[in-house]
Amino acid sequence: MKNVIKLLAKYDVPTIEKSLVQIFLDENNLKTNNKFLNEYLDSFEMIDQSDIDKIVLKNGETLTFEKFERYFELLFHSKDKKLGGIFYTPAYIAEFIVDEVLTDNPDFKVLDPSCGAGIFNLVSLYKIKEKFPDKSYVEIIENNIYGCDIEPISTNRTKIILILAALLHGENPEEIKFNVITHDSLDKSLKWDEKFPEVFKNGGFDAVVGNPPYIRIQNLEDDYKKYLQNNWASAKSGNIDIYYPFIELGLNLLNENGRLGFITPNSHFNTAAGKNLRKILKSNKSMYRIVNFDYIRVFQDVNVYSCVSIFTKKPNDEIKFRKMTEEVSSLDLREEDYKLVNYDTLDSEKKWVFLSDEEIEKIASIENVGTKLKDLCEINCGVATLADKIYLLTDYEVTTEDGETFNIEPGICKSIIKASTLHNEEEIAENDLKIIWPYNEEGNIIPESTIAKKFPNAYAYLKHVKPKLDKRDKGKPNEVAWYAFGRRQAIDSSFGKKLLTSTMNEKPNFVYCAEEDSTFISGYQVKTNKMDLEVLKKILNSSVMEYYIGLISKSYQGGWKSYAKSFIQNFGIPRFTAEELEFLENENDQNKINEFLEDIYFNRAVKTEKQTKLI
């Protein structure tokens, strides 16, 4: 990528592109008879030889076809990449997808409806040649490979990459009949059956493959946005992404035995906007195989959570699902690496969590073992000032951005804990973070006149920063008082003994806070007077909770999981016997606690009348 940036700093894209083609031909001693390629290379100014030596061929390297192809993929301005939703597809992804859709039919027809620089067309060419070695490269290009893209530069690149692949293998015809067209694939005026009658005489394509663009609907022109909403069922409502209708299109273009293979974001599984697409996929039962990369980044230069999906025109009884947990450079997966997911477990109106029957049974065991956490405890988020930099203090002496210093009175401050950075009880003991607290013991706002009289320094400070406070919440007036917190939440519920946890954790991390006068921000509290909080902490930090969250919660980069209320609230707390409670109270070895709890949650099928209610 750095080499491309260096070239883009000095030359325009067509100059770089044509220079790379010429360098590749020269480096590999290739002469072309192809009219399209010769016209393309006619009359352009080559990049400087010094840049060829220092950047393209640095350290005496040869411009191999793989490197050339990589340059072509990266030759989009960063701005264009963002707006066009274009991301470089790793070769192992394209190879896996093509392997999944390729058949034994020598007349196999495969389309990439957003072909970009031609990676899927190229991989399809090689895979078909490998399966049918008697077919020439040109014959495959002319009879098996199809492409479409909205950008002429992309369809040209696809043609060039296919010409060079044939040329590299000794095939040098003057003309090649390409099945690559320049058009918006989502435009319903495009009559695919008229463009490619030889395909649709058999009902459609044998396969559709690709890496469709990822563009949120709010980044599209209004007219195009309305067009998609009016013409594609998957896009009719919500903040959809343009890859949704590409999936719908791909399924529409398949013949009765066809397969669709895409790499896309996995957001349609769990967003409200993905509901209409989920309805289509469930009603058709078209999902056949899914490799979910979860929090693993496939595209190194962009933060997209991805999945590979293989769909079929014919309905499937089950979905073969695999979640990846580490970075890979190939997808050499066996059938036993997948778990089977029943379509009946998926509700289009809700987020999709792909679970096997065994996992569903274990989740049911966990949630129904006793009392749900939400019925036993209060689960609340912390205070929300909407201006933490103003209200939070590490020292009572505060200096503002414009150099004014104020000595805030301790009497208007409370101790506050930042749950998002909290690891253990020792950090609570060492915590010196304070918050200006303009509320009385009942949680009501202290009158402005009272603050001015009792806490003149704090009042002067708040008046000084009032312009910033007034900008909170998009400038809407604060209905309580201009110096009140931005939200009412947790003002009267965040004190007392509690368990604190961050919204995101690598593993369960519920920390006991015995300081009743401390409030908190940036996380959740779990409070109850029905059970010893230190015993509850051991349960919530157990391997059972980690397993449960691993199955039902949202993933983030690095393997972190969400511990938001919506994910932890249905976790079940068993009805322990007095003897079991005594064990939990006295045992501090978490491994022994885990073993004990796993037996209760998963092996103790019948609860007897001897069990006590929660204390």
Residues of each region from the PLM?
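Signature of N6-adenine DNA methyltransferases within the class I
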Residues: Y92-I93, C115-L122, K129, I150, ...
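Conserved acidic residues
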Residues: F108, F178, D206, Y288, ...
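Conserved residues in the N-terminal Rossmann fold of short-chain dehydrogenase/reductase
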Residues: G147, K177, I181-D184
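Polybasic, glycine- and aromatic-enriched phosphate-binding surface used to engage nucleic acids
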Residues: L251, W352-F354, E358-F583, Q590-T612
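Class I S-adenosyl-L-methionine
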Residues: M1-I150, S154-R157, P212, N239, ...
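A solvent-exposed, charged loop/short amphipathic helix patch at secondary-structure junctions
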Residues: N38, D42, K226-S234, I436
